[in-house]
Amino acid sequence: MGRKDSSTTKLPVDQYRKQIGKQDYKKTKPILRATKLKAEAKKTAIGIKEVGLMLAAILALLLAFYAFFYLRLSTNIDADLDPDED
């Protein structure tokens, strides 16, 4: 069986690997943060499709109102202009 002290001492190679890992993490941390922010912005941003659909819906609604009032007013005007009513 090994001694208790042997488990607490680390090999120089392991210490070196741990140090390299810390340095690598410090280097990549801003890159990871930027990637995370970009993904979040992409997820919450309004896309071109949504804007196009909203504009199309508003246009269709305006066209429906216009057609309704056009037809409503044009039938009233035609009734007033009938020459056969004399």
From Swiss-Prot:
<protein>
    <recommendedName>
        <fullName>Triple QxxK/R motif-containing protein</fullName>
    </recommendedName>
</protein>
<comment type="function">
    <text>May play a role in cell growth and maintenance of cell morphology.</text>
</comment>
<comment type="similarity">
    <text>Belongs to the TRIQK family.</text>
</comment>
<keyword id="KW-0256">Endoplasmic reticulum</keyword>
<dbReference type="GO" id="GO:0005789">
    <property type="term" value="C:endoplasmic reticulum membrane"/>
</dbReference>
<dbReference type="Pfam" id="PF15168">
    <property type="entry name" value="TRIQK"/>
</dbReference>
<keyword id="KW-1133">Transmembrane helix</keyword>
<keyword id="KW-0472">Membrane</keyword>
<feature type="transmembrane region" description="Helical">
    <location>
        <begin position="51"/>
        <end position="71"/>
    </location>
</feature>
<keyword id="KW-0812">Transmembrane</keyword>
<dbReference type="InterPro" id="IPR024842">
    <property type="entry name" value="TRIQK"/>
</dbReference>
